[in-house]
């Protein structure tokens, strides 16, 4: 009989209890009889996945007589090994809590109450609202006469709570309807991750995976409080420490993470580029970089064209009227063949390496210290410890979260870290990488499946009006390289897009009609359809209705007062949630008369994780299947809402006709949602009999790998990255629970037979950079892959080609970049080819030493009467506010505040401040406090603590305070949204808001009305 970790623990538990009690002289007969009467006795074990952060711990749900009786961590899962954080441990309580929505509810315009309705009536009403809006508002052609087929009056928000299969359903439905205003949580949490990592490496995902952290020699945690916000992931950090790694925490406040690290270095929020830029300067000036890695695998030798310049904080090509750059001024110098000119000697003053060196020479210890508030001694402490990994036998990893992303320079924060890791040779290696600590349960998968306005599934660009035909699209989005040793993998894009369209429109999609490409909605070039612009257009009355599923923007979006006012202007709204939230109940928020709110609201009860089946993708790209443990009652999963809703809309078009019905009627749709059917659709099918190698496949069989996808209509795939996850030979690979490894794989904890991960089950991205040009590992003691003379062994290599020493067949390791090299210098970002320090939109300074340009010259903002930004060094608001999550609450708290034991542990909104600031303001620990920004105010309880200290910045004292954002008015007397204070200023690349740095003032409250 096979013994699993779980069965072993059960046996050990019984034997240990028996041994202990027997030694104490107890009669064990009664105790043993009682032990078998545990509440899980006779219960069925069902595997599910925790619905909170992207560690995605696996959970055992115990079911007896169709009812959930208990949940616990799965000890067999290699990542969590049975462990759960406070939220995961409360999974059973969240399922059973009395606040769950159980039936569809309806709020009529101007009504002050909810009314119960049945599903059929509710979906019929929603279908009618959607069709009427689509018939009236569909834009067939733009002002230039170009076919665009888009619907702007309806929006879709959500959700990273959806499974991959639900995401596939939602995306296909929205594009069929013509919706362009589609976004989800990734926009406001980790959108800079994709934009930054893809610019440097080619892909936007976490480079390594959770278990791999144990292999590192140095951990730099910056912009994250990992111990509190990713507790299970943190155990792999502690494994690294047990193995001898040095742990560093750089963060504005001292926390549990700081306490477990070797040292903590506080820095002022919003100054990460200055801090990291100083490290870049330190590496180059001290000659600490990994020369072979830099020379062979990066674009350090590329020569930049003569139009490039940088002067006083501004790159060449800047237009102050439009606040944008002409990025053509940053292009590389071209040779006679049209390819990049390179100088392997690195002597050309315009080669990337020398331009980078010059750019960061200004980032001296003094300048960095003056801006960040970090002493020169502490700067060197971090720099020296981390830069010691810039050698073949060492590796360092950087871990970050929203402390980096939620800034007007969020993308460039992360980009700066890529410069460091490339200089040190820490990408592609075990224990290396830049690893995003994502906080949403399927934010990786929901981004892969593109619940975002600007991309199609698999990170393909969303069509714009200029690309009228599929040929136009392919020409604009398929890169061409002159370098024969570059794989240029995106040259395969036409195959992936044709297969996607075939999956969406089935037999209707043919080569003759461009695979129904015309049906896709087309964006206007340069227009932003993201969350923040949806809300601004809503505020100005330009939207009629929409869907908000599994997200609570009325609590978690910045400048919340504006957001709440905007929602009042909708004609209708459809929400799907586990509980009432600040969004679902916006019409009856404090200070508002429900009778004055016209919005018609349909509130649909959402199925809990244990009530549905499907897959999620954790932050390390592992595709994990979860089974349905119990029936959902009248609650429904998101796909079981959208599948019948689309069918009802289709029925209306068949009966009545209407505007542009074909994109809806010709969808390759289904009558009923079956999650495993959609898992197969995501993988993809052959639509014609095909021979692959010596194996023949029939129409309707599964495509075995994305290498077999075609651009001729003979294959389909709803996401090329996931092709190979479900095959005729091996079935559904996301269900695999096989912990077997080769000794080489086990040495670094790859677990290649547990679940499956994209792409092609590769566990460490860019792993061909972990070897030298002969295919030998830089660090043989922690080899990821190795060339044995005929093939690669270890992890699945980033391409099958031989090592670079083979001049004819060898390929560069960064295969998703056009020219195959990792990029120190990149031309694809809106705010510069190199990261540059700029102050936050709201800053306590009126100057800094790096340039005369105070804040980013291209950050985005709105100009309505409710969009205000405090002036630099505003004496009315002298204090920096940063926001953060809590261990016990998930993000905005909409779910966890409804779990009594979690609310009891963290019951109310508080503000952390230093003793010095408290003394200055006459505030004592436990006092009620009013916190005010130029946009709004919030109440909080003072937590006076030495965990936060004042900073000395540019010769003056700057105070910082911190507040969680997990509270809202629907939970009585706990406080309301912190985001009423935060600023509506956004990164120019991804429009993520700057929630981690704004200006406020604090005072002792005479009276509290929001907190008991």
UniProtKB/Swiss-Prot annotation:
Residues 1-33 form the signal peptide. InterPro entries: Asp_de-COase-like_dom_sf (IPR009010), Formate-DH-alph_fdnG (IPR006443), MoPterin_dinucl-bd_dom (IPR006657), Mopterin_OxRdtase (IPR006656), Mopterin_OxRdtase_4Fe-4S_dom (IPR006963), Mopterin_OxRdtase_prok_CS (IPR006655), MopterinOxRdtase_cofactor_BS (IPR027467), TAT_signal (IPR006311). Its cofactor is [4Fe-4S] cluster; W-bis(molybdopterin guanine dinucleotide). It is found in: Periplasm. Predicted to be exported by the Tat system. The position of the signal peptide cleavage has not been experimentally proven. Keywords: 4Fe-4S, Calcium, Electron transport, Iron, Iron-sulfur, Metal-binding, Oxidoreductase, Periplasm, Selenium, Selenocysteine, Signal, Transport, Tungsten. Residues 43-99 form the 4Fe-4S Mo/W bis-MGD-type domain. Induction: The trimeric FdhABC(3) complex is the main formate dehydrogenase enzyme in the presence of molybdenum. Optimum pH is 9.5. The keyword Chaperone does not apply. This is Formate dehydrogenase 2 subunit alpha (cytochrome c-553). Binds 1 [4Fe-4S] cluster per subunit. CDD domains: MopB_CT_Formate-Dh-Na-like (cd02792), MopB_Formate-Dh-Na-like (cd02752). It comes from Nitratidesulfovibrio vulgaris (strain ATCC 29579 / DSM 644 / CCUG 34227 / NCIMB 8303 / VKM B-1760 / Hildenborough).
């Amino acid at each position: 009989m096979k013994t699993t970790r779980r069965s072993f623990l059960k046996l050990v538990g019984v034997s240990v209890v028996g041994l202990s009690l027997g030694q104490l002289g107890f009669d064990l007969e009664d105790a043993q009889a009682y032990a078998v009467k545990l509440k899980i006795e006779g219960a069925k074990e069902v595997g599910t996945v925790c619905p909170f952060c992207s560690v995605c711990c696996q959970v055992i749900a115990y079911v007896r007589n169709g009812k959930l009786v208990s949940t616990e961590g799965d000890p067999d899962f290699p990542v969590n090994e049975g462990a759960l954080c406070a939220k995961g441990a409360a999974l059973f309580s969240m399922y059973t809590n009395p606040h769950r929505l159980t039936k569809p509810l309806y709020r009529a315009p101007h009504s002050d109450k909810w009314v119960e309705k049945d599903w059929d009536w509710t979906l019929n009403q929603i279908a009618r609202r959607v069709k009427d809006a689509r018939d009236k508002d569909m834009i067939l052609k733009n002002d230039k006469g170009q076919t665009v087929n888009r619907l702007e009056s309806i929006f879709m928000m959500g959700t990273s709570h959806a499974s991959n299969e639900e995401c596939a359903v939602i995306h296909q439905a929205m594009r069929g309807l013509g919706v362009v205003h589609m976004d989800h949580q990734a926009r406001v949490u980790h959108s800079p991750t994709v934009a930054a990592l893809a610019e440097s490496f080619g892909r936007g995902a976490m480079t390594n995976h959770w278990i791999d952290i144990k292999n590192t020699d140095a951990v730099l945690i910056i912009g994250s409080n990992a111990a509190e916000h990713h507790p299970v992931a943190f155990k792999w950090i502690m494994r690294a420490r047990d193995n001898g790694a040095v742990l560093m925490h750089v963060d504005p406040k001292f926390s549990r993470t700081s306490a477990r690290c070797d040292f903590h270095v506080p820095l002022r929020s919003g100054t990460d580029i200055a801090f990291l830029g100083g490290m870049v300067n330190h590496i180059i000036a001290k000659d600490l970089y990994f020369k072979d890695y830099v020379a062979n695998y990066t674009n350090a030798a590329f020569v930049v064209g003569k139009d490039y310049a940088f002067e006083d904080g501004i790159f060449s090509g800047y237009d102050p009227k439009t606040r944008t750059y002409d990025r053509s001024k940053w292009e590389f110098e071209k040779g006679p063949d049209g390819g990049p000119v390179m100088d392997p000697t690195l002597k050309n003053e315009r080669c990337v390496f020398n331009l980078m060196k010059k750019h960061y020479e200004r980032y001296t210890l003094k300048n960095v210290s003056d801006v960040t508030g970090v002493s020169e001694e502490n700067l060197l402490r971090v720099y020296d410890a981390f830069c010691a990994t810039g050698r073949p036998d060492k590796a360092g990893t950087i871990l970050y979260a929203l402390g980096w992303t939620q800034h007007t320079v969020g993308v460039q924060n992360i980009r700066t870290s890529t410069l460091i890791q490339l200089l040190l040779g820490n990408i592609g290696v075990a224990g290396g990488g830049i690893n995003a600590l994502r906080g949403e349960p399927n934010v990786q998968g929901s981004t892969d499946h593109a619940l975002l306005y600007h991309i199609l599934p698999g990170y393909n660009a969303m069509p714009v009006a200029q690309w009228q035909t599929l040929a136009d699209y392919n020409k604009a989005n398929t890169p061409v390289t002159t370098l024969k040793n570059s794989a240029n993998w995106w040259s395969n894009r036409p195959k992936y897009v044709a297969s996607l369209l075939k999956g969406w429109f089935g037999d209707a999609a043919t080569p003759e009609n461009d695979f129904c490409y015309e049906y896709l909605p087309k964006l206007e070039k340069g227009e932003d359809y993201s969350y923040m612009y949806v809300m601004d257009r809503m505020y100005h009355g330009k939207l009629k209705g929409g869907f908000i599923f599994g997200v609570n923007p009325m609590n978690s979006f910045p400048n919340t007062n504006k957001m709440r006012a905007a929602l009042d202007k909708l004609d209708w709204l459809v929400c799907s949630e586990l509980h009432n939230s600040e969004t679902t109940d916006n019409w009856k928020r404090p200070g508002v008369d429900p009778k004055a709110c016209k919005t018609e609201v349909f509130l649909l009860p959402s199925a809990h994780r244990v009530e549905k089946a499907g897959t999620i993708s954790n932050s390390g790209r592992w595709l994990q299947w979860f089974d349905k443990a119990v029936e959902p009652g009248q609650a429904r999963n998101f796909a079981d809402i959208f599948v019948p809703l689309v069918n009802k809309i289709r029925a209306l078009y068949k009966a009545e006709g209407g505007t542009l019905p074909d994109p809806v009627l010709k969808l390759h749709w289904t009558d009923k949602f079956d999650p495993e059917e959609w898992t197969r659709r995501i993988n993809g099918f052959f639509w014609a009999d095909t021979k692959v190698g010596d194996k023949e496949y029939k129409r309707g069989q599964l495509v075995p790998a994305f290498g077999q996808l075609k651009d001729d209509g003979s294959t389909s795939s709803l996401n090329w990255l996931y092709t190979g996850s479900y095959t005729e030979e091996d079935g559904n690979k996301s269900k695999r629970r096989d912990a077997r490894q080769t000794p080489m794989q086990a040495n670094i904890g790859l677990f290649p037979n547990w679940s499956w991960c994209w792409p092609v089950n590769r566990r460490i991205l860019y792993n061909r950079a972990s070897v030298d040009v002969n295919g030998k590992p830089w660090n043989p003691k922690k080899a990821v892959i190795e060339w044995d003379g005929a093939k690669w062994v270890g992890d699945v290599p980033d391409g099958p080609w031989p090592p670079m020493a083979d001049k004819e067949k060898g390929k560069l390791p960064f295969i998703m970049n056009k020219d195959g090299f990792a990029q120190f210098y990149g031309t694809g970002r809106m705010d510069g080819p190199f990261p540059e320090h700029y102050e936050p939109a709201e800053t306590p300074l009126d100057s800094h030493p790096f340039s005369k340009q105070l804040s980013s010259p291209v950050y985005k903002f709105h100009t309505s009467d409710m969009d205000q930004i405090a002036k630099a060094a505003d004496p009315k608001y002298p204090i920096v506010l940063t926001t953060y999550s809590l261990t016990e609450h998930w993000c905005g708290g909409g779910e966890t505040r409804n779990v009594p034991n979690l609310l009891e542990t963290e019951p109310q909104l508080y503000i952390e401040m230093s003793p010095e600031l408290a003394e200055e303001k006459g505030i004592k620990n436990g006092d009620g406090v009013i916190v005010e920004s130029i946009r709004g105010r919030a109440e909080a309880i003072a937590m006076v603590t030495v965990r936060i200290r004042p900073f000395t910045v540019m010769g003056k004292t700057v105070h910082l305070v911190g507040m969680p954002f997990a509270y809202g008015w629907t939970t009585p007397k706990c406080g309301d949204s912190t985001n009423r204070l935060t600023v509506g200023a956004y990164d120019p690349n991804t429009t993520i808001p700057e929630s981690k740095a704004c200006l406020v003032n604090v005072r002792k409250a005479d009276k509290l009305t929001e907190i008991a």
